[in-house]
Amino acid sequence: MNIPELFGCNVFNDVVMRSTLPKDVYKSLRKTIDNGERIDMSIADSVANAMKDWATSKGATHYTHWFQPLTNLTAEKHDSFIEPVGNDEVIMQLTGKSLIVGEPDASSFPSGGSRETFAARGYTAWDPTSPAFVKEGTLYIPTIFVSYTGETLDKKAPLLKSMTAIDRATKRILKLFGIECAKVNTTVGPEQEYFLVDKKLYEQRKDLVLTGRTLFGAPSCKGQEMDDHYFGALKPRVADFMRDLDETLWKYGVLSKSKHNEAAPAQHELAPIFSTMNVAVDSNQLTMDVMKKVALRHDMVCLLHEKPFAGVNGSGKHNNWSLSTTGLNLLDPGPHPESNTLFMLVLACIIKAVDKYQGLLRACIASAGNDHRLGGGEAPPAILSVYLGDELGAIVDSIVMGKDYVPKRAIKGSIGVPESPIFPIDSTDRNRTSPFAFTGNKFEFRMLGSSQNIALPNTVLNTAVAESFRQFADVLENAKNFDTALAKLIKETFKNHKRILFDGNGYSDDWQKEAAARGLANLPTSVDAYKTFMSEKNVELFSSLGVMSETEMRSREEIYFENYAKIINIEALTMIEMVSRDIVPAVSAYTRDLADAAEI
């Protein structure tokens, strides 16, 4: 297997575009992708025809506008390429209009009351910055989804708007440092956890089939108490699944990188390489879909529920978030972070954003499934805090106290074996209990549930940080002395938001008390978190940056509450049915058998 040749073979990527599009069309499309410029409608027919020719050469007969409604899933309607030309003949055709705009029925998707049941018209619009791909005989075209009246009905449109907001705000900051760039990219790498169970055993469990988790059961004699499953040797059946999964994902251009056993029995993880945010969101949705289908090929079922089994760890999805432009990662502190004023400014903006919007960040990852994980001694607590590590924490302290930072001498590590290499020791340890941790050149948002679409958490992060950047730029652009104003702004921000910084054990009861003393939000359940979503400052945040209107936010709040209630109701009905049809009859039969045996 030649992996470089295999990778992206089913994707209408840059290599394919360069070879199939006229030069001027290719250049125009690249400007849209690379610089965020509006698509030139005059190139639509040319791009559509090239896509169709390429897709049909891959065996595709249909195309679909692939979008992400306000569920955690994707949606698709398949239309064939055939067009009648008379004399009972057809041709294969994809027009520019069909590429750019679709018109699915919007009445049956969640709208949170923003649309009447009879109001059916909705539109899908092509996202040219995320590549199309061929899967199972269909050309998948990534799109956004809006209503006839213009409200967004999906998770991707607000994400793209938030990417625009943070791009514009960050460029203002960079310009103050003499850095000109065409575009600032937000990048993400979501670490996907999941369980694998035998298909025959799965089908015997009504609760697993209907709810994704076991509602009744006894603890296993052996769980994860021996700590021997994490990073353990892969069992042949699991290894075959992972090999098949990697190859399938690589064909779709998904940067699947790491795979390993997780802490709980039958639990595993897949981690990709970072990619541009909207592409990463699409890739993660595709990954979850492919996981389920590949598992079935191996007579297994992939469980993405956050807590499929009581008594062992549940599954999350660490969201590795960063900001970069050409040749520059804005979250790379460099060898001397204390003198890297751009990095310290970016760090201050992020800390301010997390502190100010604790409730919103908690709400954006809330779900009925995730409630079983958060604060349970296996996942981050439900209280937001930021972990910076020893070095950055000490630098922040020195800035707040107005003292010079004295860096520690670099330490080289050795395990004492002559043959082993000498290796550098990182400047900080890792804190696995932190919900929002700095890990070298990125922030790791660890509160997401495994089944969650990562669009909303990243929309919130982008928007909150963009507001901080915009506010900082307003101050610095009007400063008489830039360096003095910059130093003052960084110091004041660290001082005002230092309460959100925590490097201790997030699982401890002491942290609950300390967090309350600091005035941090403690929202233990999803319902508690959802109640904060429509706060005045949250509405102002999204509306002022053009990411979501108050109407769009209110519809989402309605959907969150409704979805939560429906999940709990389904679980309750499933429990009632299992008790009445399975458990009680089984107990009755068993007691009858015992009684008959006693008579004998």
Q: What residue ranges belong to the model's regions?
A:
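Regulatory N- and C-terminal appendages and interdomain linkers associated
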Residues: 1-2
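Active-site core of metal-dependent hydrolases
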Residues: 6-119
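C-terminal accessory/binding modules appended to enzymatic or scaffolding proteins
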Residues: 27, 34, 39, 43, ...
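Active-site-proximal loop/turn and secondary-structure-junction residues that shape catalytic pockets
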Residues: 43-47, 67-69, 97-98, 145, ...
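Short alpha-helical basic/polar micro-motif
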Residues: 49, 61, 285, 289, ...
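Short linear, low-complexity motifs centered on an aromatic residue
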Residues: 72-88, 106-107, 205, 212-214, ...
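Glycine-rich, acidic/polar active-site loops that bind/position phosphate-bearing ligands
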Residues: 120-304, 313-319, 323-561
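Substrate-recognition/cap regions that form aromatic- and gly/pro-loop-enriched pockets
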Residues: 561-600
